[in-house]
Amino acid sequence: MAETIRLTTPLTEEVSRKLKVGDSVLITGKIYSARDAAHKVMTEALARGEKLPIDWHDKIVYYLGPTPAKPGDPIGSAGPTTSGRMDAYTPTMLEQGIKGMIGKGSRSQAVVDAMKKHGVTYFAAVGGAAALIAKSIKKYEVIAYEDLGPEALAELTVEDFPCIVVGDTEGNNFYELGQKPYREI
């Protein structure tokens, strides 16, 4: 089994292009959460020529809608959202400089093409492990679109956030490649 890769943010294109499907990764640093409602607001703002609340250059976006935090915790359960919900907005957002996305599930061909063009890696966090994932989140702070509730744009400080590369900058798809050996029974 391959060794776990430790990444510290920001995620540069150079580092992103070195990651390959199947790589096990632990991320430490700042990542940003945003789901479909926030993506819709941001792409509409860009269409109007407005500036976004953060500079997305070399950032990682986590498709997350957390549950409320228990007293003393920075966040509640923090499992991934199905990434396909963001696909309509993703090519536009990748043009803003995002270099990593964290979610679950397959992506559209338009997203895969944009990932290859912009040097972006797609990571999967394990669905169903939301409470465990939350333990790697040390701070959660809403920075824009507070009216969207759990879908607001937020900054997360993470330590050893566990994920796996499921889409690399060459267009490889772990959901397909990982299953291939088991289809020939």
Annotate each language-model stretch with its function.
Residues 12, 32, 67-69, 170-172:
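Short, glycine-/Ser/Thr-/acidic-enriched flexible segments
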Residues 33-161:
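Feature captures the catalytic cores and cofactor-binding loops of soluble hydro-lyases/lyases
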Residues 90, 164-185:
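Active-site/ligand-binding-proximal alpha/beta "capping" segment
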Residues 2-11:
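Short, structured beta-strand/loop micro-motifs enriched in basic residues and often containing a Trp
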